[in-house]
């Protein structure tokens, strides 16, 4: 079943993720050219940090989430632009990296991931055709979940991958959810209900002009059309007959040499007979098939297209069989020289047009370098590859029904949109496992060729002499512009965090704040500093007045001052007569001991003061009230119930007055909302005596 168009797919993803109230939903689709699962579409349903786009009308939450998903994709395209657009790529996006939450970063970075079948959660779900449920995605190792580091920062705890629509639907949640089969059926129902109608099943013959309609009008992958080549549905019957005659002649020659050969030659003969038997088993089904086709009077070839088979085109992404079919009939008549010439040309064309392939197990295959090879060169990997292709074709509900006359063999034109390559059955045309150099050469080409093309486009000149190793290393290294941009983003983030910490500290020093924004905090701080300066001036003036009053009192009481002077003189005489240590003792006796300070009395009628400030995710709570047992614990429990997690506490108790300062982190709920200052204050006042 082909993937639906983009708008319908996004609508299904939106309906599914909103119905289960999860954070995001993604669709991984199979890229026909690369054979891997890549990003198809997605919908973000999580928390939104800020909205920079000002809309003329009020929009609903669904429309806002849909616009947010589109803005995140535009931001990724903007950030992944080429070096030529380095200076102008940021303004084209409605968002900037500083405006995203951690969960939005996780959703954004998922666009850059791809998974071969069998690798990662989407790859395993696609290969096994079973759902994969991962709980605790932020706690597992990167080998289990490749995006574990991103999930840890975004607090994504549950990830589910469900194979649907010839791809994989992935849903993620920031909460821990246990596996539920009812959840899987519920998600599948949204996609099964939108099942597209099956394509028509036309009947094709030699003179038929019926075409198969492509199932998708919106191509997802674009690639240049393949050159028009021809692949035989079966190898030429003449070549099979000639090969069988050659084998019979070899068997007769071996039988004649049996009398004179020694034991070693007999063992070689047995090996040859074993290979010959294998070849006959491979050829006999094809001969019987041709014989049955010759006996049937029908000349109609039926092609039934199924939604399960994936034979399609690289250009339209629908992977349906090419609509343009032409039946070419090669006559078997003629002299033996023409027949032999056609066989040789078939061999040459098969060898020339076989591309460098890679089997499903990841091993590279390449064409033989020269003429026919013996059957003993058929390796186990080649046999496994042919059996795998045969099994896939046999398990499909669609089969080719071919009929032709006894004097003709049918050959099917290979379309430029078909994803099948030519597959001859002759042992001489089987392909051998490539050595390590071919795989290394393929990797070298993949790494170096894109870099060379980009270099020509930027420099507009021919390349100079440079080694291949230097080219590959330069390609793998990030450009200075990318490193500078990444460093700038990190530095800007650190600066913002440090600035927020400074504002939190400044807010804790100011006893009153009108608003919680940074400008209001600065304005209130300025007013508070002015008040402090005024208080200092008042205190200094009061101190001067007290000093003047003391001087006036001392001058108005001369007798007391004279007695004090006489006492000082007596002390001085005692010190001079008795010496240092004794004088000090007498002096200490002479000095009157001041009375001890009175114990502090408890303050009566202490007023309750509660100050709460919240800046982004940081919160500060200041509390002053009458003390009671367990008050601090009750305050922390109330804050936790309002999703305010306390990180630091400073408290003191003086004369029955309890003073506390609590620093905390504010968490968001499922809808991305944070508790307000009024709610926190009201909850604290309810528990204060």
Curated annotation (Swiss-Prot):
Q: Which Gene3D superfamilies match?
A: Helix-loop-helix DNA-binding domain (4.10.280.10)
- Presence of keyword Transmembrane: no
Where found in the cell?
A: Nucleus
Q: Which stretches does UniProt call biased (Polar residues)?
A: 206-217
Please name the SUPFAM superfamilies in this protein's record.
Answer: HLH, helix-loop-helix DNA-binding domain
* Chief place of localization: nucleus
Any GO BP annotation: positive regulation of DNA-templated transcription
Region annotation (Basic motif) maps to 483-496
> Does the keyword section mention Disulfide bond?
no
Question: What's a single GO CC term here?
Answer: nucleus
Q: Which InterPro entries match?
A: bHLH-TF_ACT-like_plant (IPR054502), bHLH_dom (IPR011598), HLH_DNA-bd_sf (IPR036638), MYC/MYB_N (IPR025610)
Q: From start to end residue, where is composition biased (Acidic residues)? A: 246-271
Q: Which UniProt keywords apply?
A: Activator, DNA-binding, Nucleus, Transcription, Transcription regulation
> Which residues belong to any copy of the bHLH domain?
483-532
**Molecular functions per Gene Ontology:** DNA binding; protein dimerization activity
Q: Region entry Disordered: which residue ranges? A: 192-287, 458-489, 547-570
User: Quaternary form?
Assistant: Interacts with MYB123.
PANTHER family xref list: TRANSCRIPTION FACTOR TT8 (PTHR46266:SF4)
Homology family: Belongs to the bHLH protein family.
What the protein does comes down to:
Transcription activator involved in the spatiotemporal regulation of anthocyanin biosynthesis specifically in the inner pericarp of red-fleshed kiwifruits. Functions in association with MYB123 to activate the promoters of LDOX (ANS) and F3GT1 that encode the dedicated enzymes for anthocyanin biosynthesis.
Q: What is this protein called?
A: Transcription factor BHLH42
Q: Which organism is it from?
A: Actinidia chinensis var. chinensis
């Amino acid at each position: 079943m082909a993937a639906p168009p983009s708008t319908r797919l996004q609508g299904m993803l939106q309906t599914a993720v909103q119905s289960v109230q999860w954070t995001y939903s993604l669709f991984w689709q199979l890229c026909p050219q690369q054979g891997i699962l890549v990003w198809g579409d997605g919908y973000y349903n999580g928390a939104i940090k800020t909205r920079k786009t000002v809309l003329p009308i009020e929009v609903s939450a669904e429309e806002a989430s849909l616009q947010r998903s589109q803005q995140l994709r535009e931001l990724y395209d903007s950030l992944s632009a080429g070096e030529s657009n380095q200076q102008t790529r940021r303004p084209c996006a409605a968002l900037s990296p500083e405006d995203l939450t951690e969960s939005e970063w996780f959703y954004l970075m998922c666009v850059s991931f791809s998974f071969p079948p069998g690798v990662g959660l989407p790859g395993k779900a696609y290969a096994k055709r079973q759902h994969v449920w991962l709980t605790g995605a932020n706690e597992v190792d990167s080998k289990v979940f490749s995006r574990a580091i991103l999930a840890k920062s975004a607090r994504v705890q549950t990830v589910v991958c469900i194979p649907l629509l010839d791809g994989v639907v992935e849903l993620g949640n920031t909460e821990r959810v246990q596996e539920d089969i009812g959840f899987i059926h519920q998600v599948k129902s949204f996609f099964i209900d939108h099942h597209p109608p099956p394509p028509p099943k036309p009947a094709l013959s030699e003179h038929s002009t019926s075409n198969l309609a492509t199932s998708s009008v919106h191509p997802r992958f674009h690639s240049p059309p393949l050159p028009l080549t021809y692949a035989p549905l079966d190898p030429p019957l003449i070549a099979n007959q000639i090969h069988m005659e050659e084998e019979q002649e070899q068997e007769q020659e071996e039988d004649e040499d049996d009398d004179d050969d020694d034991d070693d030659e007999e063992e070689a003969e047995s090996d040859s007979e074993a290979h010959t038997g294998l070849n006959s088993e491979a050829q006999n089904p094809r001969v019987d098939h041709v014989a049955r086709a010759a006996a049937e009077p029908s000349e109609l070839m039926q092609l039934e297209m199924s939604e399960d088979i994936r034979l399609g085109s690289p250009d339209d992404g629908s992977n349906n069989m090419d609509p343009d079919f032409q039946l070419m009939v090669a006559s078997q008549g003629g002299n033996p020289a023409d027949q032999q010439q056609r066989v040789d040309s078939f061999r040459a064309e098969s060898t020339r047009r076989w591309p460098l392939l890679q089997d499903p197990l990841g091993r590279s295959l390449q064409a033989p370098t020269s003429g026919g090879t013996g059957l003993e060169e058929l390796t186990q990997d080649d046999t496994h590859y042919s059996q795998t292709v045969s099994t896939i074709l046999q398990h499909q509900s669609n089969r080719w029904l071919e009929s032709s006359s006894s004097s003709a063999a049918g050959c099917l034109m290979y379309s430029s949109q078909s994803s099948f390559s030519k597959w001859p059955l002759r042992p001489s045309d089987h392909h051998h496992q490539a050595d390590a150099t071919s795989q290394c050469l393929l990797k070298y080409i993949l790494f170096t060729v894109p870099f060379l093309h980009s270099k020509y486009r930027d420099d507009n000149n021919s390349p100079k002499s440079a080694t291949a190793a230097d080219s590959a290393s330069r390609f793998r290294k990030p450009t200075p512009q990318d490193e500078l941009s990444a460093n700038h983003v990190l530095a800007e983030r650190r600066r913002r965090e440090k600035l927020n910490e400074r504002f939190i500290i400044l807010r804790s020093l100011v006893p009153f704040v009108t608003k919680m924004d940074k400008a209001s905090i600065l304005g209130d701080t300025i007013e508070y500093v002015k008040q402090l300066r005024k208080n200092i001036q008042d205190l200094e003036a009061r101190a001067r007045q007290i000093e003047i009053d003391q001087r006036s009192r001392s001058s108005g009481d001369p007798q007391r001052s004279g007695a004090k002077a006489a006492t000082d003189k007596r002390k001085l005489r005692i010190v001079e007569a008795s010496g240092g240590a004794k004088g000090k003792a007498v002096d200490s006796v002479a000095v009157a001991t001041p009375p001890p300070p009175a114990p502090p009395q408890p303050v009566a009628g202490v007023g309750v003061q509660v100050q709460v400030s919240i800046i982004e995710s940081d919160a500060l709570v200041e509390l002053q009230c009458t003390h009671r047992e367990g008050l601090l614990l009750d305050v922390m429990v109330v804050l936790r119930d309002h999703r305010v997690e306390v990180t630091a506490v400073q408290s003191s108790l003086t004369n029955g007055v309890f003073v506390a300062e609590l620093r905390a982190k504010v968490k968001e709920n499922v809808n991305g909302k944070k508790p307000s200052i009024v709610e926190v204050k009201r909850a604290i006042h309810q528990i204060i005596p």
